[in-house]
């Protein structure tokens, strides 16, 4: 819980791990129940929360569930980025609009989902069946616009945390590892499950530890 978050962050740092925390964008337009809610839409509460996050050593935030592209929401994106920058926090947007040059305006902007991302593989088998086909399109369509926070690289064949049920992955481990290079985003959030740390081939884990997330240039190969 919130009262133990500082202990959690300290433990992560002892393992040389930095932490991003998830938030809902909230607001009167947003009726989701997943919390924490009502922290990001109110300027006073948001600034106080971000100061607290900085003080306990959080590296960044992932803000989710934005309500369309109306002017008020577009202003909210930039307000979150600006306040986060003031507090040394990086920002990932999820459930959001396409990025619009924010990487040139805010040095703490990491990336945006704005794509039918990896979570859909868990929702429906259809997305697993089409994963390889869609992966051939993303670099030439969505990812040309800006950083794409796909959150992929599944190593379980069955897409639940215990690898014993749910949808069936149709792609190989090598394919999954390749998406860490194919899909450009300054931070790659791998879809690891706890059992992967003991069950996955060590070569896969070593690759995920070492693969770069930023590149000097990107070239399309015909």
Stretch-by-stretch model annotation:
Residues 1, 20, 186-192:
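Generic hydrophobic/packing signal
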Residues 1-172:
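Aromatic- and carboxylate-enriched substrate-binding clefts and catalytic-loop regions
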Residues 86, 115, 182-184, 188, ...:
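Short, well-ordered loop/turn and helix-capping segments at boundaries between secondary-structure elements
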Residues 153, 181, 207, 211:
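Residues that form generic nucleotide/phosphate-binding pockets
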Residues 165-166, 175-191:
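Catalytic domains of carbohydrate-active enzymes that cleave complex glycans
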Residues 192-222:
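Glycan-recognition and catalytic regions of carbohydrate-active enzymes
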């Amino acid at each position: 819980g919130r009262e133990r978050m500082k202990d959690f962050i300290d433990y992560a740092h002892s393992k040389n791990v930095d932490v991003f925390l998830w938030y809902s964008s909230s607001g009167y337009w947003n009726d989701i129940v997943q919390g924490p809610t009502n922290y990001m839409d109110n300027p006073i509460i948001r600034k106080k929360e971000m100061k607290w996050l900085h003080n306990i050593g959080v590296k960044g935030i992932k803000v989710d569930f934005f309500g369309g592209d109306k002017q008020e929401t577009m202003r909210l994106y930039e307000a979150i980025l600006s306040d986060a920058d003031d507090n040394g926090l990086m920002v990932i947007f999820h459930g959001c609009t396409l990025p619009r040059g924010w990487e040139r305006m805010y040095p703490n902007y990491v990336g945006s989902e704005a794509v039918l991302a990896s979570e859909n593989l868990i929702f429906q088998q259809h997305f697993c069946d089409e994963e390889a086909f869609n992966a051939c399109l993303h670099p030439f369509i969505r990812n040309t616009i800006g950083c794409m926070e796909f959150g992929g690289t599944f190593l379980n064949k069955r897409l639940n945390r215990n690898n014993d049920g749910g949808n069936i992955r149709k792609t190989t481990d090598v394919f999954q590892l390749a998406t860490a290079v194919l899909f450009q985003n300054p931070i790659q959030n791998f879809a690891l499950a706890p059992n992967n740390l003991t069950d996955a081939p060590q070569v896969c884990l070593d690759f995920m530890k070492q693969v770069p997330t930023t590149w000097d240039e990107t070239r399309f190969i015909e």
